[in-house]
Design a protein with these regions (language model features):
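A short alpha/beta connector and helix-capping loop motif
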Residues: 16-25, 107-125
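Active-site beta-loop-alpha junctions of metal-dependent nucleic acid enzymes
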Residues: 66-91
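A short acidic (Asp/Glu
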Residues: 12-14, 106-113, 130-136
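An anionic, glycine-rich sequence signature occurring as long contiguous blocks
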Residues: 116-252
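Active-site-proximal, Lys/Arg-enriched surface segment
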Residues: 1-54, 58, 368-379
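Short, conserved catalytic/metal-binding motifs centered on acidic residues
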Residues: 1-9, 53, 60, 78, ...
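A short, flexible helix-boundary coil/loop motif
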Residues: 141-199, 263-280, 284-380
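A C-terminal functional module that forms or caps the active site or interfaces directly
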Residues: 229-235, 240-282
């Protein structure tokens, strides 16, 4: 599972529910200049609201949504929207893991999610002590591996993927290598129910032990020193690619959810320039995205059934409906009605049905089935 936030931008002229100014946030942002990705950042003010989305990356389905002002911190509704997603899939599925971005690096929040039995994949910030320790240990493990030795508590793994470029005689094949180092039981002092506080300096304080995956090389491109990606996880698996693949799914929410919602579903094209219009439109867009996924799954199952020779479509549904209800009768009395099997109606009418009586069906059994006491039935 993936959880992320995205802005639903508006303008200062929008009408809010309580008459207050449109929510806004001011910060530095790099202009969208593709020819110069290192353009100088400028101060901008963005108006609108923020959406919290829980996304299932394999089926590409939104599971929960929350909306609040754009200046609200990402952590504000992070747990609530995840809890809502768990309720929405209760009885059908279970959320086993969640991938988050650096905006959710909060010890209290992560500890609360972990208590629910959900595995967490989240990258550490470059200046964090836990990230610096993980990089240092990973480099030593890699150097020891080059000498044919191993470093205790570390696992070095590589994955090679062939990528074909071009076609025909000019086609070339490139091998992309991803190198990971898994570091087990790395101390993290801020990952607890209280977050970062003075208890960390206590002699009796025991930091949270996490597994970390350090990405030394990603698809053939080596990471710069001191800037290697460090993925923190509560997954006890020894293979570092478990955490790598789990976090890699987070990129799907940017393209298959946020971008598609804005570009293909016109998320920011609000039908009314008001807060209510923004909220209604957001829920409607993500509801439609979920319905489309459900329809595609239904069509896929129907196509496979048709290839096996099974009948599909409305004709089959009507036949099944007729088969399941051919021996039922509906009885009306004033403003009440009841649906009975034919033999039940006959028994209630004082008739005998030998075929069902041999199976143990009697008037008393029918009355008990519908919660009518036998004495009350005799008196009536």
């Amino acid at each position: 599972m993936v959880r992320d936030c995205t802005d639903d931008e508006a303008t200062p002229s929008y009408k809010t529910d309580d008459g207050r100014p449109v929510p806004h946030v001011t910060g530095e942002k790099r202009p969208d200049v593709r020819a110069n990705r290192h353009a100088k950042k400028v101060e901008v003010t963005v108006y609108g609201w923020k959406l919290w989305v829980v996304w299932e990356p394999q089926m590409k389905m939104p599971l929960a949504l929350a909306i609040d002002d754009i200046q609200v911190h990402d952590n504000q509704h992070a747990y609530e929207v995840l809890a809502q997603a768990q309720q929405n899939v209760a009885g059908i599925a279970r959320i086993r893991s969640v991938a988050l971005d650096r905006g959710f690096l909060d010890g209290k929040l992560l500890s609360r999610i972990e208590k629910d039995g959900i595995l967490i994949y989240i990258p550490a910030k470059a200046n964090m002590r836990v990230a610096q320790d993980a990089r240092e240990i990973a480099r030593r493990a890699w150097e020891e591996g080059q000498r044919g030795r191993s470093l205790e508590g570390c696992v070095v793994r590589e994955r090679h993927e062939k990528v074909r470029h071009g076609s025909g005689k000019k086609a070339t094949t490139e091998i992309l290598t991803t190198t990971l180092v898994g570091v087990r039981e790395l101390g993290c002092d801020w990952w607890n129910e209280d977050g970062s506080n003075s208890k960390e300096n206590s002699k009796s304080y025991e930091p949270k032990l996490l597994n970390a995956t350090v990405v030394l090389r990603w698809d053939g491109a080596p990471k710069e020193a001191e800037h290697e990606v460090v993925i923190l996880t509560t997954n006890p698996a020894q293979d570092p690619f478990e955490a790598f693949d789990g976090y890699d799914d987070r990129s799907l929410i940017e393209n298959t959810c946020n971008r598609e919602a804005k570009e293909q579903w016109f998320l920011e094209h609000h039908p009314k320039r008001s807060e209510a219009g923004v909220r209604v439109h957001a829920y409607f867009v993500f509801m439609c995205m979920a319905l489309v996924v459900g329809f595609r799954v239904h069509r896929s199952n129907s196509d496979r059934a048709r290839l096996r020779g099974q009948e599909t479509g409305i004709a089959r549904y009507r036949r099944e409906l007729r088969t399941n209800n051919w021996d039922k009768v509906m009885v009306f009395t004033e403003e009440h009605f009841g649906i009975f099997r034919n033999y039940e109606f006959a028994l209630l009418g004082g008739l005998s049905v030998l075929r069902n009586e041999r199976k143990g069906e009697s008037l008393a059994v029918v009355l008990e089935r519908y919660g009518v006491p036998a004495q009350r039935a005799d008196s009536s």
